[in-house]
Swiss-Prot record:
It is found in: Cytoplasm. SUPFAM superfamilies: Protein kinase-like (PK-like). Interacts with calmodulin (CaM) in a Ca(2+)-dependent manner. This is Calmodulin-binding receptor-like cytoplasmic kinase 2. Keywords: ATP-binding, Cytoplasm, Kinase, Nucleotide-binding, Phosphoprotein, Serine/threonine-protein kinase, Transferase.
Length: 411
């Protein structure tokens, strides 16, 4: 029988909506980095109460029919104009082997246009806030994913250009096994296209919905969680300056044929402040996806690496329950997944939140409790109470090790 040990946690109130906008994406207007009041990060236990208030953090305009809302008014970026190409192509470096075996090539708009047969829906593999993603096989036989920016975004050209260049600049400086690889970009008239690694097995959300026809077992889910944690840790600790992804969610996690995770979509990424400057956060209007947004960021406009930690906590709950962060089709008590999960957890009924597609056994039940415990620490309302992504990676590594050992002994 599973343990019915009672727990008590406080979690931050998620961004919710009162209408059908569960995938709504916020956009931002940037402000200069400003120092915050000094506060000492101490290791604290999660407060001994459950937050009873879940704030409706935004109300989408009635006139918006898309799931993505663009209110960006960023200042113009001279870099964008200087990087436009009259031929509609950009010179990039592509590596197909090891670091010493690189090929230099040039993407052109015509090549991509022909390969997708005028961006035919038959080549479409995804849709997001940035635009549409297509699978492309070019003349050299290599397969890529190309992200074509929405034309509607160009009504606010400065904001669209800034977001496009943000993703390019971020992708160009990161290299990690669990991050989608960047190959280049194309600008041709009003067309803006990113060329990135093609990851063959769809999104994590597709697999949790069983759209791919196979249920992810607990071992695979722990691998995915660990991969994502390592990728975010790399962004926070091993890039200079650190990078805040700002849109960690299941539809931005791609799976390889071996079910290893790759974090994608850096359109909302921001550079964290240089610690030498004395700044502790970036002041910026909100950008992200409803249900995953850090409530402290929502109320203070102060973005830090701990905002990614909060989103990661939501992702962990999603991995374990199989549910989306916001499920408007459910009753009021179950509509917000993290609120429902923590109530079950604190009442000692943890096993009831396990994805019904997973078997209830001793190994799965233990992993469920341990990962949920860490997830709720990530969901603490105040960033100082959340663990770092490095700490999350270490904890997940240990949970996965214990899970494998318990699974092997029970066979």
């Amino acid at each position: 029988m599973p343990s019915r040990r009672r727990h008590s946690y406080t979690v931050g109130s998620p961004a919710t909506t009162s209408s059908n906008y569960s995938n709504t994406t916020f956009t931002d207007r940037s402000f200069p980095t400003t120092p915050a009041r000094t506060s000492t990060d101490t290791t604290t236990s999660i407060a001994r109460r459950i937050s009873g208030i879940f704030i409706n953090c935004f109300t989408p305009p009635d006139s918006v029919s898309s799931n993505y809302i663009d209110n960006s008014k960023s200042s113009s970026d001279n870099n964008i104009r200087s990087r436009r190409s009259s031929t509609g192509s950009s010179s990039v470096q592509r590596s197909y082997g090891n670091a010493n075996e690189t090929e230099h090539t040039r993407f052109t708009f015509d090549e991509i246009y022909d390969a997708t047969k005028n961006f035919s829906p038959s080549f479409r593999i995804g849709q997001g806030g940035f635009g549409t993603v297509y699978k492309v096989k070019l003349r050299d036989g290599k397969t890529f994913a190309v992200k074509r920016a929405k034309k509607s975004m160009h009504d606010d050209r400065q904001g669209a250009d800034a977001e496009f260049m943000s993703e390019i600049q971020t992708l160009a400086q990161v290299t990690h096994l669990s991050l989608v690889k960047y190959y280049g970009f194309v600008v041709h008239n009003d067309e803006k296209i990113l060329v990135v690694e093609y990851v063959a097995n769809g999104t994590l959300r597709d697999h949790l919905d069983c759209k791919e026809g196979k249920t992810l077992d607990m071992a695979t889910r722990l691998d995915i969680a660990t991969d994502v944690a390592h990728a975010i840790t790399y962004l926070h600790m091993y890039t200079q300056p650190p990078i805040i992804h700002r849109d960690i969610k299941s539809s931005n996690i791609l799976l390889t044929e071996n079910y290893r995770a790759k974090v994608a979509d850096f359109g909302f990424a921001r550079l964290a402040p240089d610690t030498d400057s004395g700044a502790t956060h970036v002041s910026t209007q909100v950008k992200g996806t409803a249900g995953y947004l850090d409530p402290e960021y929502l109320t203070t406009y102060q973005l830090t690496e701990k905002s990614d930690v909060y989103s990661f906590g939501v992702l962990l709950v999603e991995l374990l329950t199989g549910r989306r962060p916001i499920e408007l089709s459910r009753g009021q008590k179950e509509r917000i997944t993290i609120r429902w999960a923590i109530k079950k957890f604190t009442s000692g009924d943890t096993i009831s939140v396990l994805d019904p597609k997973l078997e209830q056994n001793s190994a799965n039940n233990l992993a469920l409790e341990k990962v949920l415990e860490m997830a709720f620490q990530c969901l603490a309302p105040h960033r100082r109470s959340r663990p770092s992504m490095k700490k999350c990676s270490e904890i997940l590594w240990g949970i996965r090790k214990d899970y494998r050992e318990l699974l092997n002994t029970s066979l």
